[in-house]
Amino acid sequence: MHWWADPWWVNLLALVPFLVFFYWRRKPLEISGKLLFFAGCFAVAFGFVEASVVVYLRGALGVLPGIGGTLADVARLSSSLYQQSYTLDQFPKSLMAVETVREAATMLMLASVAFLSASRWRDRWAVFLWSFALWDITYYASLRITTGWPMSLNDLDVLFLIPVPWTARVWFPVLVSGLTALAVVLGRMPNLPMEAPVASESQNL
């Protein structure tokens, strides 16, 4: 049992929230709370849509004799599918190609929202990370509510397929996404420089 992400370089993503936080603290982000709210609404809604796609896909792959393809069946199958690495070893090759393109399209949609929401690249990057973080957290929360998976944060998941499959325990993307969202919020806060005390008139006499 490995506790960290694979391939090894995926673990470097844990540095992202800390790096962007210190970068943004040098010059706070110029993103309004209203922008973050609506970008967050999009991300949460999109996260549920993403989870729904996975639910439908599992249901379709689980349509076998004795299985009705219902939500209850999907919930029953979810754990065993991941424990057996079903999504990598037995996933139909034709659907794997579609899934890879779908992942790329997902990133393009999140990037497009960020590009349209801000004019400066640093603010666009912040909106992208904010949207991605909320999308990712909502994705796992929606799967948990609808299918009962993940049963714990230690469950193994396939995060992405581009350029190669990324695998990690669920706690890894949830933690990184949570810290990234926090970094964006803190990155909006203005710096408060220490002001030198002003001498009183009596001291100047």
What is the meaning of each model-derived region?
Residues 1-15, 93-96:
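Hydrophobic transmembrane alpha-helical segments in integral membrane proteins
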Residues 10-11, 35-39, 100-103, 124, ...:
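Residue-level signature of transmembrane alpha-helical entry/exit and packing/kink sites
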Residues 11-21, 105-114, 168-187:
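Hydrophobic cores of alpha-helical transmembrane segments in multi-pass inner/ER membrane proteins
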Residues 22-37, 53-64:
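Membrane-interface helix-loop junction between the first two transmembrane segments
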Residues 23-29, 186-197:
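Membrane-interface capping segments at transmembrane-helix boundaries
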Residues 28-44, 117-134, 197-204:
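Interfacial segments of alpha-helical transmembrane regions
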Residues 47-60, 133-151:
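Transmembrane alpha-helix/helix-exit interface in multi-pass inner-membrane proteins
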Residues 54-100, 152-170, 174, 178:
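Extracytosolic (periplasmic/ER-lumenal) interhelical loops and adjacent juxtamembrane/interface segments
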